[in-house]
Regions:
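Nucleic-acid endonuclease domains
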Residues: 1-100, 104, 112-256
Length: 256
């Protein structure tokens, strides 16, 4: 369908729409006219100028209908559709697939989001990198070796890691950034310092893997022994990562 054909179809359909549907369309169109500042790294092969604009518009449309941050499932779907529209071969992983979330030009990507109220601009926290399934996990420090190996095995099945971070969500101004976490940095956990939190009342007991370099903490893995039994990545220095793009925008005030 050509651009003119699409415009004519919208014009023809407008008189048949109920008032609230017209309000929805009007708000979305109004959002696209608000101030915005979309930026991409000149070296990013993933976020082209077209992908930058299209993904930013999807974020703006989302916030016309919700105050909540863009969720992981929306991130996955939007990235796939926008890349395909731009001519890139992309496909979401089969439902239930562990490890990667999307394949882009033969590379397997893990997609994460971060949107905590206490988010820190210069350090990254992944509250659930993966679930920690079977294996021995009690109060023995050596149990953490097996849990760390689960993490390293998961990394072996992916090529790249992207995280969409919601840095500002103070309606009407929003700020998102897309950051790539270098896989080699995470692989440094293989020689990290392990510590079991023996004072914890949890069972199994939580533990840490501290990844340090020149007496500086680069990040830590947190083996969360709570109900979900999950692995967190804490305090990852953003300076070790690549910022592919940022999207800052305003939305029209008022309600639908």
């Amino acid at each position: 369908m050509t651009r003119d054909e699409r415009i004519q179809r919208l014009i023809a359909a407008s008189p048949t729409l109920a008032n609230y549907r017209l309000q929805l369309i009007d708000k979305i169109v109004s959002a696209f006219a608000q101030p915005k500042d979309f930026r991409r790294s000149a070296t990013s092969e993933l976020i082209t100028p077209g992908v930058l604009e299209d993904f930013g518009d999807v974020l703006r449309m989302h916030h016309c209908l919700s105050r909540e941050p863009f969720s992981k499932d929306k991130f996955e779907y939007a990235l796939e559709r926008i890349l395909i529209e731009s001519g890139v071969v992309a496909s979401l992983a089969p439902r239930g697939q562990r490890g990667f979330d999307i394949e882009i030009s033969t590379e397997k990507f893990s997609l994460k989001t971060e949107a905590a109220k206490a988010i820190r601009e210069n350090t990254i926290h992944i509250s659930k990198f993966m679930e920690l399934g079977g294996g021995t996990w009690g109060s023995n420090l050596e149990d953490l070796i097996g849990l760390r190996q689960q993490f390293l095995t998961a990394l072996a099945g992916i090529n790249r890691i992207l995280i969409l971070r919601t840095l500002k969500k103070s309606d009407p101004i929003f700020l998102y950034e897309l950051v790539e976490i270098p896989k080699p940095q995470l692989l440094k956990a293989s020689t990290g310092r392990l510590e079991m939190m023996m004072q914890s009342t949890q069972n199994p007991k939580p533990g840490y893997c501290y990844v340090e370099e020149n007496e500086e903490l680069l990040f830590s893995l947190y083996f969360d022994g709570g109900g979900e039994r999950k692995l967190q990545v804490k305090g990852l220095q953003k300076s070790l990562c690549t910022v592919h793009a940022t999207w800052q925008f305003e939305l029209p005030t008022g309600t639908l």
